[in-house]
Amino acid sequence: MTRQIQLALATFRPRRAIPGQTVLDPSVTRTRVRLGDLDIYRHVNNAVYLNMMDTGRSNLLADCGGMPLLNDRGWYPVVAASTVKYRRSLTLGQRVEITSRVLGWDPRIAYLEQVVTTGGQLAARGIVAGRFLSKTGDRVPAPDVVALLGGPETSPALPDDVAAWARAMDVAHRS
């Protein structure tokens, strides 16, 4: 439950924007492993990684000044698909960094990478296909969101593995 509170704070009382931060710059979220994050095997439950990544994405938007802009338009992010590869267990009290970055976008989806590390070692890597909706439920084109956040008109080329993943997950835009 405390992770949900952390996400609510990151979303509704976002941290201050970082001057000069763009939508393509990485954003770092720092936290510690808490007792409530652990499963019966005494390591972080896989669902908790997803909660940490949710907070990381909210902080990414906050860091580039996006939260008030999105709120003014009634736009909000949702996850269309995600995949996480777990590399190392996290245990009670460990310091954790979640580095979130936008890799690129197509007409519908923004693609993000989220890397979870502890002590400089990789614990997990997530790939997320995110989209934005309006309060009425209409889809907001990813390029419109990127433009609102001051990003470039043209998406960087997606890494090959992410482009292949997007096709396999059936989230990639079909021309």
Task: State where each predicted segment sits.
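HotDog/MaoC-like acyl-thioester-processing domains
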Residues: 1-17, 90-95, 101-175
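Catalytic strand-loop segment that frames the active site of acyl-thioester-processing enzymes
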Residues: 2-59, 160-175
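Sequence-level motif detector for i,i+2 pairs with an aromatic at +2
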Residues: 24-28, 74, 81
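Generic structural detector for well-ordered beta-strands
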Residues: 30-34, 85, 131
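Short histidine-centered beta-strand/loop micro-motifs
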Residues: 40-43, 88, 94
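Membrane-helix exit/interface motif
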Residues: 61-66
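Short, basic/aromatic beta-hairpin or loop at an interaction surface
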Residues: 68-77
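Short structured motifs
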Residues: 80-86
